[in-house]
């Protein structure tokens, strides 16, 4: 039995483990099957030819904090009543408190054939371990071709990052003289792109300037990679078949099946963990906590949001043991969207969609800036490896 058992060895799990250890919780274990830990935000730049994949990866062992046990295994079920977790190896682990940072998986029930489509050379996804292919397709796409990009319905890891590949690809095609001859289509399965009234019109303007055909409130309904074609369905139920020369696919996502089967999702759609989005504590099981993409956080997920969530989660977990006051997560998040090769909008907002900029009030918080791009490309990765995963930021 572990004092704190953490499911998921990504940003949420590792940073939570580091913070817990710093607060004196000594018996901490992380369940994570992968041997490679990836800094996912950097994959946008891998897909744009601005970063090598090796810069986004470390071994899982190297990022696991000293004093934390790494259980190299996959979770198959959780019994919150018994406080136990069963793994694919057959091992079962008990816990006093359970922290869920399991993230999301592609929802093959909502869009069949996602992983099969990735076997075709014209389909790529920065979200599904194909960022290097994204760059090859962007680099080699001929003039007079058609590129299609997709944005799924929630939940998804950082909605802003779903449109980053389009803008960075367009910047490359523009720089190499292939725009405006490359046709670009963006399929967005939601009524508004980010649901931020001040930001969405700005992004729409950038898309218009690039001549992008935007299909709002439209879902990818079927994949035909052998024919280089997708079928989309709009809000009125009207189907359209779209041929492509390049498809950047961000599929619909859901929580792992064991979340729902274990009763941890409650009434939440798509199998995300049913937590109080202010305290990060499960609504029915007080010894269960969750953060990140796979939790019902009631705001757009992002690395900036997760850093604040983990701080609140760890503080509250420790406080719950001593009867201390609980902290509250205010819903802060950030959408770092590169709209040119070397300029970026760092849009900060809260769970209501209101801007929550950390910039001085006299500066336009939605202006694309080269400094914001440089921080996103070079500063944040260093902060991630050396500060965030170490529980120091």
Regions found by a protein language model. Name each.
Residues 154-172, 303-312, 344-347, 351:
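Short, electropositive alpha-helical surface patch
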Residues 68-78, 85, 93, 174-271, ...:
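A Rossmann-like FAD-binding core segment of flavoenzymes
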Residues 291-339:
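A conserved FAD-binding loop/helix module that cradles the flavin
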Residues 271-288, 339-353, 357-359:
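FAD-binding beta-loop-beta segment adjacent to the flavin cofactor pocket
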Residues 1-69, 153-197:
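Beta1-alpha1 glycine-rich phosphate/pyrophosphate-binding loop at the start
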Residues 68-164, 168-177, 237, 248:
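FAD-binding core/adjacent interface of flavoenzyme oxidoreductases
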Residues 346-393:
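C-terminal auxiliary extensions adjacent to catalytic cores
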Residues 110, 115-143, 243-308:
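FAD-site-proximal beta/loop scaffold in flavoenzymes
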């Amino acid at each position: 039995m572990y004092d704190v058992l953490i499911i998921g060895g990504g940003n949420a799990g590792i940073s939570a483990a580091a913070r817990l250890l710093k607060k004196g919780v000594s018996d901490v274990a992380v369940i994570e099957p992968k041997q490679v830990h990836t800094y996912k935000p950097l994959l946008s730049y891998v897909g744009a030819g601005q970063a090598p994949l090796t810069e986004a990866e470390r071994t899982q062992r190297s990022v696991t904090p000293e004093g934390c046990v790494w259980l190299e295994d996959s979770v198959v079920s959780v019994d919150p009543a018994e406080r136990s977790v069963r793994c694919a190896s057959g091992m079962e682990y008990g816990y006093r408190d359970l922290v869920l940072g399991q993230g999301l998986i592609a929802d093959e029930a909502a869009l069949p054939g996602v992983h099969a489509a990735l076997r075709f050379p014209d389909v790529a996804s920065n979200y599904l371990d194909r960022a290097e292919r994204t760059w090859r397709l962007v680099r080699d796409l001929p003039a007079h071709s058609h590129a299609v990009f997709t944005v799924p319905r929630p939940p998804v890891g950082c909605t802003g990052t779903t449109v980053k590949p389009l803008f960075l690809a367009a910047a490359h095609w523009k720089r190499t003289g292939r725009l405006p001859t490359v046709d670009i289509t963006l399929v967005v399965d939601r009524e508004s792109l980010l649901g931020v009234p001040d930001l969405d019109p700005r992004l729409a303007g950038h898309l218009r300037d690039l001549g992008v055909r935007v299909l709002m409130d439209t879902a990818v309904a079927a994949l035909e990679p052998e024919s280089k074609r997708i079928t989309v369905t709009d809000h009125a139920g009207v189907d359209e078949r779209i041929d492509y020369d390049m498809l950047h696919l961000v599929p619909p996502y859901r929580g792992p099946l064991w979340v729902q089967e274990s009763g941890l999702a409650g009434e939440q759609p798509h199998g995300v963990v049913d937590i109080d989005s202010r305290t990060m504590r499960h609504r029915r099981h007080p010894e269960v906590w969750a953060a990140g993409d796979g939790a019902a956080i009631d705001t757009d997920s992002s690395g900036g949001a997760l850093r604040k969530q983990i701080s609140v989660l760890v503080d509250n977990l420790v406080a719950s043991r001593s009867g201390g006051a609980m902290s509250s997560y205010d819903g802060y998040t950030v959408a770092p969207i590169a709209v040119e090769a070397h300029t970026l909008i760092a849009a900060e907002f809260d769970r209501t969609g209101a801007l929550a900029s950390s910039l001085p009030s006299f500066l336009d918080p939605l202006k694309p800036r080269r400094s914001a791009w440089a921080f996103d490309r070079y500063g944040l990765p260093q902060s991630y490896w050396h500060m965030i995963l170490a529980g120091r930021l």
